[in-house]
């Protein structure tokens, strides 16, 4: 099924955390040994830290480590073989979801006023996720 919208974001995450949900919600900080922390209308992900590399300079700047987040806005849930790390519903009254960290946010269309976030990964590393899929699914009612 074709997504309503799809965004892939690959970049260094200098805080080691990616935030998905309401951009003004209080970001959860207690991961309790997990890779995902769920708050009110927001989810925080422990992603590969930008400094998780051998320290090499490239053209006068650091060659930072990156993590990639694939975000899809879907009409209905799709079955996946990836490990599901989180399945929660957030309020999206503006019909948008923000993805980012303190360095910047990207706004993505949400499929409804309440959105189910299904977060999965095919490579779950306890030091931080390197590839993450975030499916946004409309919640009826």
Where are these regions (language model features)?
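Short beta-strand-plus-loop segments that form exposed binding edges in beta-rich domains
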Residues: 120-124
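Surface-exposed coil/turn segments at beta-strand junctions on protein surfaces, enriched
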Residues: 38, 110-112
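Extended, solvent-exposed segments with strong compositional bias
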Residues: 75-103
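A short tyrosine-centered beta-strand micro-motif
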Residues: 113-117
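Generic hydrophobic secondary-structure signal
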Residues: 97, 119, 134-136
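Primarily secretory-pathway and cell-envelope proteins
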Residues: 1-79, 125-141
């Amino acid at each position: 099924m074709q997504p309503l919208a799809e965004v892939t974001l690959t970049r260094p995450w200098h805080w080691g955390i990616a935030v998905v949900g309401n951009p003004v919600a209080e970001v959860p900080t207690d991961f309790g040994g997990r890779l995902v922390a769920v708050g009110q209308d927001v989810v925080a992900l422990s992603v590969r830290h930008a400094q998780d590399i051998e320290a090499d300079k490239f053209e006068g700047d650091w060659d930072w480590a990156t993590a990639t987040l694939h975000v899809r806005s879907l009409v209905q849930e799709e079955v996946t073989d990836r490990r599901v790390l989180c399945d929660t519903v957030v309020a999206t009254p503006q019909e948008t979801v923000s993805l980012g960290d303190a360095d910047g946010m990207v706004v993505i269309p949400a499929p409804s006023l309440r959105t189910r976030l299904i977060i999965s990964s095919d490579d779950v590393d306890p030091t931080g996720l390197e590839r993450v899929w975030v499916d946004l699914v409309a919640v009826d009612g």
